């Protein structure tokens, strides 16, 4: 089977509080053979800017991420499981976790909520039937999906995505220093390939996830701007790029563990502060 072939029998499983335990049991089995985990989140935008002096633009970008992740709540998490060849498990390949979120009580950016509502996010259901993040974290910690060097995470411009996951897993605010953030990141997610970071070595590939998918001639399954569909498309893009641009081998020393827009992946931002989130927010447009 060629890498990242689309099989329309793929199902995206919706996970709410009522079926969380049952679906996490399935994931504990799936991860044994399908150890490539493509991930995406949906979150309520950006509501704050850090103030003060910053050592560098890279430092500013991390502080921008930190203050927003600390203030806001995750809305959705999508996880798609694939094997070394880019093949999916039979039946369900993608789980979309829907978290508790209350438009009356929780902070958000209005434009982000409008986009997510248009994309089919059911905020009333999130309020009434959403998953509690702390309980989800307990299940994820023992799932074999995190804290495992054999699991390879695939993402797209994913500083904020991993920021929210680290906040959930540690049940605390993000560390003040970016170096400490990357230390925690390596603990929970020892192997990460950020597709947007890989694109730096791919001639002519540019833009957000949807634009990249179109350039790679990939067909989306499910609605854009929902975490399940976006995680599935991220996984497809990784395997298609690996085949087309990397001769089916990614140099870990060069690419593993780098997040586009943060740390060593932040050199692309040279024209002032504040633009990394804007690109992040429109990454699937």
UniProtKB/Swiss-Prot annotation:
A divalent metal cation 1 binds at residues 40, 161, 278. Its EC number is 3.1.13.4. GO terms for molecular function: 3'-5'-RNA exonuclease activity; DNA-binding transcription factor binding; metal ion binding; piRNA binding; poly(A)-specific ribonuclease activity; RNA exonuclease activity; transcription corepressor activity. Its main location: nucleus. It holds the Pfam family CAF1. Keywords: Cytoplasm, Exonuclease, Hydrolase, Magnesium, Metal-binding, Nuclease, Nucleus, Repressor, RNA-binding, RNA-mediated gene silencing, Transcription, Transcription regulation, Translation regulation. GO terms for biological process: deadenylation-dependent decapping of nuclear-transcribed mRNA; defense response to virus; miRNA-mediated gene silencing by mRNA destabilization; negative regulation of cell population proliferation; negative regulation of type I interferon-mediated signaling pathway; nuclear-transcribed mRNA poly(A) tail shortening; P-body assembly; piRNA-mediated gene silencing by mRNA destabilization. InterPro entries: CNOT7/CNOT8/Pop2, RNase_CAF1, RNaseH-like_sf, RNaseH_sf. SUPFAM superfamilies: Ribonuclease H-like. The keyword Zinc does not apply. Its cofactor is Mn(2+); Mg(2+); Co(2+). It catalyses: Exonucleolytic cleavage of poly(A) to 5'-AMP. A divalent metal cation 2 binds at residues 40, 42, 230. One of its GO terms (cellular component) is CCR4-NOT complex. It is found in: Nucleus; Cytoplasm, P-body; Cytoplasm, Cytoplasmic ribonucleoprotein granule. Binds 2 divalent metal cations per subunit with RNAase activity being higher in presence of Mn(2+) than of Mg(2+) or Co(2+). Component of the CCR4-NOT complex; distinct complexes seem to exist that differ in the participation of probably mutually exclusive catalytic subunits; the complex contains two deadenylase subunits, CNOT6 or CNOT6L, and CNOT7 or CNOT8. In the complex, interacts directly with CNOT1. Interacts with AGO2. Interacts with TOB1; recruited by TOB1 to a ternary complex with CPEB3 which is required for mRNA deadenylation and decay. Interacts with BTG1. Interacts with BTG2. Interacts with NANOS2. Belongs to the CAF1 family. Has 3'-5' poly(A) exoribonuclease activity for synthetic poly(A) RNA substrate. Its function seems to be partially redundant with that of CNOT8. Catalytic component of the CCR4-NOT complex which is one of the major cellular mRNA deadenylases and is linked to various cellular processes including bulk mRNA degradation, miRNA-mediated repression, translational repression during translational initiation and general transcription regulation. During miRNA-mediated repression the complex also seems to act as translational repressor during translational initiation. This is CCR4-NOT transcription complex subunit 7. It comes from Mus musculus (Mouse).
């Amino acid at each position: 089977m060629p890498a990242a072939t689309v099989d329309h029998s793929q199902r995206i499983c919706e996970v709410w509080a009522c079926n969380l335990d049952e679906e996490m049991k399935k994931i504990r089995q799936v991860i044994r053979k399908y150890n490539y985990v493509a991930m995406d989140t949906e979150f309520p935008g950006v509501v704050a800017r850090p103030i003060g002096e910053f050592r560098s633009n890279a430092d500013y970008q991390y502080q921008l991420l930190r203050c927003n992740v600390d203030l806001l709540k995750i809305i959705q998490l999508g996880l798609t499981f694939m094997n070394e060849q880019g093949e999916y498990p039979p039946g369900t390949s993608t789980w979309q976790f829907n978290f508790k979120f209350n438009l009356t009580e929780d902070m958000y950016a209005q434009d982000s909520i409008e986009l997510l509502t248009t994309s089919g996010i059911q905020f009333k259901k999130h309020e009434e039937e959403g998953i509690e993040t702390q309980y989800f974290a307990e299940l994820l910690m023992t799932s074999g999906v995190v804290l495992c060097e054999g699991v390879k995470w695939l993402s797209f411009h994913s500083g904020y995505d991993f920021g929210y996951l680290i906040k959930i897993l540690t049940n605390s605010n993000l560390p003040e220093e970016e170096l400490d953030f990357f230390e925690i990141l390596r603990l929970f997610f020892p192997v990460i390939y950020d597709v947007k970071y890989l694109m730096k070595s791919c001639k002519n590939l540019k833009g957000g996830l949807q634009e990249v998918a179109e350039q790679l001639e990939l067909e989306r399954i499910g609605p854009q701007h929902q975490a399940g569909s976006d995680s599935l498309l991220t996984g497809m893009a990784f395997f298609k790029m690996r085949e087309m641009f990397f001769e089916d081998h990614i140099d870990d020393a060069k690419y593993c563990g780098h997040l586009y827009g943060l740390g060593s992946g932040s050199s692309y931002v040279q024209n002032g502060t504040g633009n990394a989130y804007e690109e992040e927010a429109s990454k699937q447009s």
